[in-house]
Swiss-Prot record:
InterPro entries: DNA-dir_RpoC2_beta_pp, DNA-dir_RpoC_beta_prime, RNA_pol_Rpb1_3, RNA_pol_Rpb1_3_sf, RNA_pol_Rpb1_4, RNA_pol_Rpb1_5, Rpb1_funnel_sf. It catalyses: RNA(n) + a ribonucleoside 5'-triphosphate = RNA(n+1) + diphosphate. It comes from the Bacteria. This is DNA-directed RNA polymerase subunit beta'. Keywords: DNA-directed RNA polymerase, Metal-binding, Nucleotidyltransferase, Transcription, Transferase, Zinc. Binds 1 Zn(2+) ion per subunit. Zn(2+) binds at C219, C293, C300, C303. It comes from Nostoc punctiforme (strain ATCC 29133 / PCC 73102). GO terms for cellular component: DNA-directed RNA polymerase complex. Residues 1319-1349 have a biased composition (Acidic residues). The lineage of its organism: Bacteria, Bacillati, Cyanobacteriota, Cyanophyceae, Nostocales. DNA-dependent RNA polymerase catalyzes the transcription of DNA into RNA using the four ribonucleoside triphosphates as substrates. One of its GO terms (biological process) is DNA-templated transcription.
Amino acid sequence: MTNEKMIFRNRVVDKGQLRNLISWAFTNYGTARTAVMADKLKDLGFRYATKAGVSISVDDLMIPPTKRLLLEAAEEEIRATETRYQRGEITEVERFQKVIDTWNGTSEALKDEVVVHFKKTNPLNSVYMMAFSGARGNISQVRQLVGMRGLMADPQGEIIDLPIKTNFREGLTVTEYIISSYGARKGLVDTALRTADSGYLTRRLVDVSQDVIIREFDCGTTRGLTIGPMTEGAKTLIPLATRLMGRVIGEDVVHPVTKELIAARNSPIPEDLAKKIEKSGVGEVVVRSPLTCEAARSVCQHCYGWSLAHAKMVDLGEAVGIIAAQSIGEPGTQLTMRTFHTGGVFTGEVAQQVRSKIDGTVKLPRKLKTRTYRTRHGEDALYVEANGIMLLEPTKVGDVTPENQEVHLTQGSTLYVFDGNKVKQGQLLAEVALGGRTTRTNTEKAVKDVASDLAGEVQFAEVVPEQKTDRQGNTTTTAARGGLIWILSGEVYNLPPGAELVVKNGDAIAANGVLAETKLASLHGGVVRLPEATPGKSTREIEIITASVVLDQATVTVQSSQGRNNYLVSTGNNQVFNLRATPGTKVQNGQVVAELIDDRYRTTTGGFLKFAGVEVQKKGKAKLGYEVVQGGTLLWIPEESHEVNKDISLLLVEDGQFVEAGTEVVKDIFCQNSGVVEVTQKNDILREVVVKPGELLMVDDPESVIGRDNTFIQPGEEFQGNVATELRYIQYVETPEGPALLSRPVVEFAVPDNPDVPSTTSVSQQTGRSIQLRAVQRLPYKDSERVKSVEGVELLRTQLVLEIEQEGEQDHNASPLAADIELVEDTENPEVQRLQLVILESLVIRRDITADATQGSTQTTLEVYDGLTIAPGSVVARTQILCKEGGEVRGVRKGTENVRRCLVLRDVDRLTINTSTQPKVKVGDLLVEGTEVAPGVFAPESGQVVDIKNAAAASGGESALSTKNYVITTRIGRPYRVSPGAVLQIEDGDLVQRGDNLVLLVFERAKTGDIIQGLPRIEELLEARKPKEACILCRRGGEVKVVYAESGDEAIAIKVVESNGVVTDYPLGPGQNLIVPDGSIVLAGQPLTDGPSNPHEILEIFFSLGSEDGIYACASLALQKVQTFLVNEVQMVYQSQGIDISDKHIEVIVRQMTNKVRIDDGGDTTMLPGELVELRQVEQVNEAMAITGGARAQYTPVLLGITKASLNTDSFISAASFQETTRVLTEAAIEGKSDWLRGLKENVIIGRLIPAGTGYNTYEEPGAIDDYAAEISSSVLDEVDDPLDMVLDDRTARTYNLDSPTLGESGFGSRRAERSVLDDEDELIADEVVDDDDFEEEEEDDEDDFDDE
């Protein structure tokens, strides 16, 4: 290179410049030489970095001296805000907002200061050099080092209104450090989650786009995409030149002024041409795009444009789908999910502020449309409803009348000055809303609790409560009009339940005076028992015996067996009862206390029970047994039953056989009685063997005796020639020897009508409660019940049951009484213990509470002593609630059924103001802090005036002499401002404790920019999910008319009037804010409210608009609108994070999401309704239908998310390898699908060569190779023939005709292909004639499955 060519450029080469340099070298000189240059640059950099020794020391961190002043100013402003809040001028929310915005502004101002300071004092400062050259770090990190860290968010994402005022150079305080670590932890968690999410996103993207391969040179489409620079508000995110680079022009570009041709159709756009087009001032250019490419199932070379890796036209067979997927997925890890990289530091978009340049007066023109509104800081301002200007009239200096200054205001701006206001230079006039997207800042409804700072009485001032009841019947009280809620100070006592006040409003009470008392009364009366304090039981229980019963003749003995005590009660008539309930336990009404021990009713075996004369209560529980009502005889027919459940082969006797006692009936089972065997078996399993004792009488004539089956024979009756001596039971049996009658013995048990009861004495109160023990006989079995048992059973039990009569107390709240079992010593003989049952009422006395913060202390006195008999309802103990400090009782509500709180107004709660002049206030006025109460005298604290006295008159002197001395007494209070719509949680006049919630303020806050950003937003877009709070889209274009609610400024609906007069209504839901002004013209598909748009809705709106060109044009238009929307939205997210991705990658993915339609009506085609088919395919079939005159298919375009699109590909192998494998494969099998192995994934799974790169078959058609060489030679061979470019890639090899070895006969067979007869101009229907031996090589080209239609 000669010296004449040397150009010296004197500029700083920072990160951006380096990038441009390398990109230029790469485009112009190829890979190898660029690599060498990059290497040299690296050496250069390292050499000088080493020489300079740039490093950061603590001294390099220079803190701007203005920091202190800035912080002081901010703190001053916040103090002022705090005062306004204390005075009730702004709500809690407005205070919070103001604090946050103040700190935010300060932080930003400080950041600018830092930069200025560095530039002024030391531009070679190493921190400054590093950050601003782009080597390491960025401005926000520098800000944290030398400015202030600023506001942080807590784990819930709420901003903490305590900023970190220090930086890392000064060091953080402990509090600041802890607040900092919130954000840091969040960042770590986020990174961990993000990598996983991002990886999965990449996987889905690859899956949806893996079969997009460049398969043609030119699809010949005339459609294209109109591209302009990408802007957000006034800021250009991506300039036009950048977006054009590497594209192919779709329509000739003509210079807007000279009308000369800049670039022709189908020419690629290198960097210089892109710059030239941008300079010429062309606003938008039509380019070819993968979105509009008409190649079937692929993208053609012209529509894709450059391969960005080589800055050359893309090759045939390039797998652009995979490249696109990776280009979008890879930066995913850099996208934030929630927090910013700065460790949770809050960054907010500050609106652009307009400050006055001069001193002067504000003049607002008449035609400027404004309405007053309250800003989020609680200040009054004007909202500009339509674009306009305001004038500043400068203050006259001398005779010169200077020019008026104009300030332009856009719709949505906020004016902080009013007509006629005087302003100083530098004063804030307005905040201009930034145009574009930021005006649709997403707001969300949020609520904030306001808790009371002091205890006292609630008083509403100007607040108008309004009650609403929802469908569930819950009532909410909201403030219809905003205003103040006052809490007037006083000590509030919470009274325990059941307490009765002993004072009334206005009473004076001394410290420790009684406010209220609770009485503890006995319900039933009786004898008082005060138990001694045992370790387990405290004396706070009082027992009152209401009734008792004693077994006076019976003695109780205790038998211990195996560690368990058995209590036996022996009565005078030699009966022994076993106690079923142990002493010290409670017994319920009707429970068994004891059971008689006797053996008279025991049987020896199981058997059959019949009643003779015995009657039992019908409704008995089988578990407890049946109570005997009337005595009689029980007849018991014994039989012996063995339950076996073994195999039938073990049976040693047969059914009906007579056996002697001791015979082995089943292996290891012997019978105990002689009798007839009855065997029950099922499925060769022996269930049971029953031996029925008795005598067997053989009969000859079965008919004559069949009537005697199951009857009794009385003693003395003659039967079958024998005279019976006792009662027998006759049964007919079939024995192996023949029919016979079995005469079975019967055992009789006599049951008396009433069992004898041990004697008792009972004591009962006059209340009519009585208690007694009753003896009951119970039978465990029913009449004719078979009892299976080998051992004996007990047929009758005699039990003692407790009975408590509750007279006149059928109401359920009288608890079911229980009796206590006790052992008492006999009065005459202390050795003997008697059994006593008592009914106790036990009352618990409250503990004495020493003064609790909210309750006052309590004191309890006992009114009874041990052994005293009391009447029902008498008071046993009373608890008094004492007042802590003296004062006046207030706030006792009349008429409310139970008083839960009362208030004592103490001296501490009052404040006296002395004034020598006549007061301006009257009793009952509510004053906020700083109000003038008399000329020159101001209220030191907020409160309510309770008294105004003339001191002289009060002292009893002549009032005429000194009227100059007034005393104003106020009751300290605290105002809280309530915004309209807030939910009230208290009522006027309520008493509240400190910390009780007063109201829920409902407010709208701008969502922090990063709530749904980054990955989640990209996922939402690519999965085509409906956004949570979507905006309302205009369905048809027209003029906007805003409908306001009656109350005034809140818009409740939008009407759009079309040109032909049709009106469409759009009601506004809660939290939806208008972004179109009244009277403006909107287009179809334009958002009317803020929030993200729903892509499905965009598609539907444009499809339903219709067009003259038929359904295909209509669907194409709708799809194109949605495609551009998606591409731009995805770009927005990446741009907001400073990541550059070429549009074409996103377009490839979006193309895959939007190439299907849902068939509504198949017409005469073979397609079914609901089927998802490619748009181009349907259109092809429809064209065929049009020729034959059949009915066309009707369809609706659909937008599929990437997961759904992957599962709906033509290739079932690819879909199955992605998700839901079994479902995909079974459905494919049922439908008999075939897979044409078009994509990469299918081929990898089957194990074939993939149809991309070297595996792509360029030589399908003779002559293709020649076109191909011509195609690329023009664009590639400009500077490649340079010996330095050592990298030899396939492209250059092909151009130099270094033929890559093709496979011979041994490979896939020779590939002979001819164009088919059906060859069509637009190449949509192309068919291959394939050799028979070419079966493995499936039709790879754009072969279509519908040729035979």
